[in-house]
Amino acid sequence: MGWIRGRRPRHNLEMSEFHNYKLGLAKSDFSTRCQKQRCPVIKSKCRENASPLFFCCFIAVAMGIRFIIMVTIWSAVFLNSLFNQEVQIPLTESYCGPCPKNWICYKNNCYQFFNESKNWYESQASCMSQNASLLKVYSKEDQDLLKLVKSYHWMGLVHIPTNGSWQWEDGSILSPNLLTIIEMQKGDCALYASSFKGYIENCSIPNTYICMQRTV
């Protein structure tokens, strides 16, 4: 009996330690399972939080690209309008007499720039119907406004095949120091462009034109 009593406390101690050990393992296993179960949840939440951020970044980039495109378009439109704007005439020039309504009065001459396209003969007839003629260049000083012209317009200059000269509608010969004639196409008529240049063109091709009326 003494031996049995002596062993029971030891047995109880071992059982208690074994029970505590199993309890510790159970807690550790439970903690591990909890951590494993929580990780997908946390990752899912991270993805959910990342989605709005990614969407916001995508929207910001798209808006930035759109802004750059719009600025490029606006710049192109502005530059196009700048280089193709109508002739700006100084208002301080001396009085040059009466001109038809809406015509430009400049240094004893009246000018009108017509945007409708006609061939050379139709353009000439249109000017004559308004008691004017197609543009004649006779002086770089008195007609310095012609430096501002940006596009091509019919003027009253034609080629005479018999002698190879260029003449104005009134029969006068072109002075070589007034215009630089450039052969753009085969033809017997000439278009005026900027900086006192004339471009050879087929007379039957429609173009805009300039009418001119002398006041003196």
Curated annotation (Swiss-Prot):
Membrane topology classification: Single-pass type II membrane protein
Disulfide bonds: 96-105, 99-110, 127-211, 189-203
Occurrences of domain C-type lectin (ranges): 98-213
Keyword match NADP: no
One Pfam family hit: Lectin_C
UniProt GO MF annotations: carbohydrate binding; identical protein binding; MHC class I protein binding; MHC class Ib receptor activity
Superkingdom: Eukaryota
Cellular-component GO terms for this entry: cell surface; external side of plasma membrane
Tissue: Natural killer cells.
Topological domain spans for side Cytoplasmic: 1-51
Cellular localization per UniProt: Cell membrane
Cited PANTHER family: NKG2-D TYPE II INTEGRAL MEMBRANE PROTEIN (PTHR47494:SF1)
Extra remark: Is not capable of signal transduction by itself, but operates through the adapter protein HCST.
Function: Functions as an activating and costimulatory receptor involved in immunosurveillance upon binding to various cellular stress-inducible ligands displayed at the surface of autologous tumor cells and virus-infected cells. Provides both stimulatory and costimulatory innate immune responses on activated killer (NK) cells, leading to cytotoxic activity. Acts as a costimulatory receptor for T-cell receptor (TCR) in CD8(+) T-cell-mediated adaptive immune responses by amplifying T-cell activation. Stimulates perforin-mediated elimination of ligand-expressing tumor cells.
Record-given protein name: NKG2-D type II integral membrane protein
Organism: Macaca fascicularis (Crab-eating macaque)
Source organism phylogeny: Eukaryota, Metazoa, Chordata, Craniata, Vertebrata
Gene name as annotated: KLRK1
